[in-house]
Amino acid sequence: MRATRSHDEREFTFDERDFRRVCRMIRDRAGIHLHPHKRDMVYSRLARRVRALGMEKFGDYLDHVETDPDAELQGFINALTTNLTSFFRESHHFDALAEHLRTRGRDGVRIWCNAASTGEEPYSLAITACEAFGTMTPPVRILATDIDTNVLHTAARGVYPVERVNTLSLQRRRQFFQRGSGANAGLCRVKPELQAMIEFRPLNLLSEDYGLRGGFDAVFCRNVMIYFDKATQYEVLQRVVPLIAPDGLFFAGHSESFGHAHDLITPCGRTTYRPASGVRA
């Protein structure tokens, strides 16, 4: 069994003061609240950045993030964000979306996926749109955003290990993916028609102005709010909900609930919401 280093044997000194400082910085810049039991995870992820920059102390690294944010703030955020995802995760949402899309007609449907991660969710949305409209070129545009620029790069490429795609039915794999061969054996790429439907863009949900046009027919904001406290959740919803069409849908994660924001969104299904009456951009 491979031995692991104890706290005293760590490559870099990382004390409680450093951890509290990291917690404050990631909360202020990304809204993420880190629990005390995440201390070892924080060390492991940020130690890679300290090492990559040739620094010797965590304090020096955190000083660098704060004094030169253009150089390292994004690297700091990327290291601490969690990107657990899969194709058609929480599949009932995609069934509900398909029904919703069929009611929208062919006038141009807009969907916002605001935790795109490595792309499985926005591509699942694109597949759902193709199936709902019965064509590889449905009248649907998808905006896929994430605070982590590294995962957005992976998402835009649309290339995945076969094991990641094998959770899909054989019909979906054949219709929506191209299997690699030779040097690309063991990989699959989403078909160009899916990529053409999606715009990938970095976005921080804590930003005061997202710079987005409203009227989204559906917004997927799943398993993001669990990292925010209730006050931050409400602030984010104040910005997001007015961007949804009055009869549009807001999809949340299975462990997220928003009773404290009943004036903004109203439940209409399993972790599915509509804008509350009177909410406008």
Please place each PLM-identified region on the residue numbering:
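A structural alpha-helix within SAM-dependent methyltransferase catalytic domains
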Residues: 98-102, 126-131, 241
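A short glycine-rich, Lys/Arg-flanked "PGG" loop and its adjoining helix->strand segment in the class I
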Residues: 234-246
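Core SAM-dependent methyltransferase catalytic element
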Residues: 218, 259-281
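Conserved SAM-binding loop of SAM-dependent methyltransferases across substrates and taxa
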Residues: 118-135
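Short conserved AdoMet
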Residues: 106, 160, 245
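Conserved class I S-adenosyl-L-methionine
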Residues: 107-119, 141-143
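Conserved AdoMet
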Residues: 1-112, 251-253
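Extended basic-aromatic, gly/pro-enriched interface segments that bind polyanionic ligands
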Residues: 135-220, 224-235, 257-259
